Structures are given as C-alpha cells and as structure tokens.
Amino acid sequence: RDSSTSRGLGDVYKRQPVHRAFNTLIGLNSVRQMNTPEAWSSGVPAFGGVASARGMAQFYQACLGLDELRVFPSAVRGWMRNVVIDGPDLTLKTPTAFSCGFMHDPADPATGRKLRHLFGSGGFGHAGAGGSHAFADPAHGLSFGYAMNRMDLNVLPGVKTRNLISAVMKEVAEECF
C-alpha cells in the first residue's frame, strides 16, 4: 500500500462530519472506554443515556402517557410523535427521520413507505450504542427496551436487534387481530 495514499484518505476522513460526530474532545476512542462511570458522567452530547432494558421500556411507557405519574403532558407527547425532519443524514450516510428528540423510521419520498421498521407502527424511539434499542408504539400501547450484554459495532441496530424487533411486532400484530 502506498503510504501517501493512506495518509491522504485519513486526511479526507478527518474532514468528514462522521469523524467529528464519532471522535469527541474528551477522547472516547474505544468501545471499552464508553462503558465506564467516567464516560457516563462526562456530559458528552448525544451520549450517556445509561439504562436497563426495563428502565428504557418504562421511560417509553411515560412517553405514551401510560405511566402513573403522567410525566409528559399531552402537547409534549405530540412533539415526540410528529416527524419534523425526514431525509438524507449527512453524518450517518443513510436516510433518517426525527421528531423533537426521537428517531422515527424514515420514509421513501416517492412512495411514503417506511425504509426501515425499527419503531413499530407510528412509533418513535432511539437506537443506542452497540445495538441497544428502545421505542414506543402508540398504535399498540407498547413500549420496548433492549440492552445488549455485548456491543454490536453498527451505528443502527444490527441483525440480532432487528430480528428481535420483528418478532415482537409480529406477536403484537397477531394479538391485535
């Protein structure tokens, strides 16, 4: 391999938005560093939501308004559900859709059909580091939380997580009919 070519590609990568997004100022340069109390409390934007699967599911029950305390007012729950941006994500290099604070399944602009099925029918949530995933599905009154014991290195949920989501949604669909 030509070292000048390698160096040139590295320089190109460093100018990309994805490099800035995934290389923080405090230097979390490995998966192992992410799983420490110091990293969790560092206050890095878009990082640090540490919870159990049960805790994530309970949070999304609150997002649906199905919690005992009614933490989120109806208007706020509307902001969670309504997509405000849907299109190409220049950082992740894939289509994404977001409401205020939550991911949604992106839609094909030509047909309106979902490009991915990660959040249920009209659902919203967030993919987490390493394959963890959580969401609320308002159509079924369902909240879902999945925390991995061993990190998957995909940016979006990998095959294992997607298969689990598919199995849950299939079961929910069968229960409703």
State each model region's role.
Residues 1, 45, 130:
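Generic anion/oxyanion-binding catalytic loop in active/binding sites
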Residues 1-13:
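Single conserved hydrophobic/aromatic residue that forms the stacking wall/gate
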Residues 2, 86-89, 137:
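Acidic side chains
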Residues 8, 101, 128-131:
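Glycine-centered small-residue hotspots that permit tight backbone geometry or close packing
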Residues 12, 53, 154-155:
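Loop/helix-junction capping segments adjacent to catalytic residues or to phosphate/diphosphate-binding pockets
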